[in-house]
Design a protein with these regions (language model features):
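N-terminal active-site segment of His-dependent metallophosphoesterases
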Residues: 1-59
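Active-site glycine-centered loops adjacent to acidic/histidine catalytic or metal-binding residues
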Residues: 4, 51-52, 84-85, 162, ...
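Extended active-site neighborhood of metal-dependent phosphoesterases/phosphodiesterases
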Residues: 56-153, 175-207, 215-259
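Short, well-ordered beta-to-alpha junction loops that form the rim of enzyme active sites
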Residues: 121, 160-165, 212-213, 269-270
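Short acidic, glycine-rich surface-loop motifs adjacent to enzyme active sites
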Residues: 148-175
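A short C-terminal boundary segment appended to hydrolase-like catalytic domains
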Residues: 247-248, 255-297
């Protein structure tokens, strides 16, 4: 499984902004193809986009949508996509067009002994404003309960969504404040306890996969005395195609997961055009990097 977070920003044919799609095609997808070709022949491979496949900036762009689909579909792997906030921006038209081009916003599928659930947790409440941490509507909770009720309990479940459920600073009124001192002002989703109670029944275990933040983070939470990790994936576009790194310093890239039955037998981050053995860079003490602001155009 290859989780990727693309993010495109071209609203027109501006040659500068067209480079977003070009970089994804000639860098990210080219690197993914190299990774796939390095695997033993016959290895089943599939991809997951963690959302933000496109950014419309106030107008639907059929040409951009087509270019993105072509890029995402240019390898031999089957790819599934979660819808992100920028794929819809609070507009029914954008969400409908995304469904026409990519598929439903809430769906599930099986691969081997793993059951994937992809769900739209971008809850818009005023124009383009959305809750962070992510939230679910009642109808989605009903659908999720029905889906999991039909799933064999010896499978592993991987819940895929865009906005983290375990931390955010633009909360819904029922979101729960985080109690750690370094997380002051941040919250967990009002649905988190319910989600974990539904997932805990699976003997094969479960994982939480998200994107959205443009930094890499395994956020640890305690649920009923157990440590639970939410895997927040860095973005293929880094700091929105304005550099070669995410805002935390993680290089543009994607993740590679290997499964044996219900177990993740291997996992590594693949920096674009870096060897997979490249996993860390050390800097001298007192070297400052600003990871809180987006780079200027």
């Amino acid at each position: 499984a290859l989780p990727i977070c693309p993010y495109y920003t071209s609203p027109d044919d501006n040659p500068i902004k067209k480079s977003d799609v070009e970089r994804f095609t000639t860098q990210t997808m080219a690197d993914i193809k190299q990774t796939i070709s390095s695997l033993p022949a016959g290895t089943p491979v599939y991809g997951l986009s963690m959302g933000d496949d496109v950014q419309y900036y106030g107008g639907y762009n059929a040409k951009l949508e087509r270019q993105i689909r072509q890029a995402l579909g240019s390898s031999e792997m089957r790819l599934f996509s979660v819808i992100g906030n920028h794929d819809q921006d609070g507009k029914a038209l954008y969400r409908r067009k995304w469904e026409e081009n990519f598929g439903p916003t809430d769906f599930s599928f099986n691969r081997g002994d793993v059951h994937y659930v992809c769900i739209n947790n971008c809850f818009f409440h005023r124009g383009m404003s959305y809750y962070s941490p992510g939230e679910l509507r009642e109808r989605q909770v009903r659908w999720l309960k029905q889906d999991l009720a039909l799933t064999p309990k010896d499978m592993k479940v991987i819940l895929c969504y865009h906005i983290p459920f375990t931390f955010g600073n633009a909360p819904f009124s029922k979101a729960k404040p985080l109690t750690n001192a370094h997380e002051e002002g941040h919250y967990s989703s009002s649905r988190l306890s319910l989600l974990l109670s539904l997932l805990k029944q699976f003997k094969g275990g479960y994982e939480l996969f998200c994107g959205h933040t443009h930094f890499a983070c395994n956020h640890e939470i305690n649920y009923e005395g157990e440590d639970v990790m939410e895997h927040c994936h860095a973005a293929a576009c880094g700091n929105i195609w304005q550099s070669n790194i995410n805002i935390c310093g993680t290089p543009n890239g994607y993740y590679v997961y290997s499964f044996v039955g219900t177990s993740i037998s291997n996992c590594y981050y693949k920096g674009t055009f870096w060897d997979k053995s490249k996993q860390m860079t050390l800097f001298r003490a007192q070297t400052d990097f600003n990871g809180e602001k987006y780079a200027k155009d």
